[in-house]
């Protein structure tokens, strides 16, 4: 590659490619944030449910969700122990308070991940705005030179 400056058209092409790459990365991060939000909501529900169970009496009849908005009647046999997923498809029985602490720690980690992804997304959006402005400048420059059909996103 020579030291010769690039033409505005080539600069624009490179900027458009970079913009599209940032756009794809931003879309991926938004999808990841959606998954994180669903996980956070599930953790919040589990923490709330364990809290509610701790106030229930053993033998108390309750409705247990079985999916698709359906419930089954059940009697609580133990309010102080729950079964929690510890990862890798493995679930273990834990004291309710210990399970709540474990779930709160997961929730905290999820919140931190969400914060980092939002920060990365903000940086990408800033870079996309910078590229957009550069493309607009190049487009004006090309129009002054008398030949552009426009390429700003």
Curated annotation (Swiss-Prot):
GO terms for biological process: protein folding. It comes from the Archaea. Keywords: Chaperone, Cytoplasm. Its main location: cytoplasm. InterPro entries: PFD_alpha_archaea, Prefoldin, Prefoldin_subunit_alpha. CDD domains: Prefoldin_alpha_GimC. One of its GO terms (cellular component) is cytoplasm. Transmembrane segments: none annotated. It holds the Pfam family Prefoldin. GO terms for molecular function: unfolded protein binding. The keyword Nucleotide-binding does not apply. It is found in: Cytoplasm. Belongs to the prefoldin subunit alpha family. Heterohexamer of two alpha and four beta subunits. HAMAP family: PfdA (MF_00308). Molecular chaperone capable of stabilizing a range of proteins. Seems to fulfill an ATP-independent, HSP70-like function in archaeal de novo protein folding. This is Prefoldin subunit alpha.
């Amino acid at each position: 590659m020579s030291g010769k400056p690039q033409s505005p058209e080539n600069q624009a092409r490179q900027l458009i490619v970079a913009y599209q790459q940032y756009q794809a990365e931003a879309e991926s991060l938004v999808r990841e944030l959606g998954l994180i939000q669903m996980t956070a909501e599930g953790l919040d529900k589990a923490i709330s449910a364990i809290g509610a169970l701790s106030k229930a009496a053993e033998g108390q009849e309750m409705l247990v969700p079985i999916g698709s908005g359906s419930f089954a009647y059940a009697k609580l046999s133990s309010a102080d122990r729950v079964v929690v997923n510890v990862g890798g498809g493995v679930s273990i029985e834990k004291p309710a308070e210990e399970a709540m602490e474990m779930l709160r720690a997961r929730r905290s980690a999820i919140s931190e991940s969400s914060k980092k992804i939002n920060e990365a997304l903000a940086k990408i959006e800033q870079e996309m705005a910078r590229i957009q402005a550069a493309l607009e400048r190049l487009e004006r420059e090309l129009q002054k030179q008398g030949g552009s059909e426009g390429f700003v996103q």
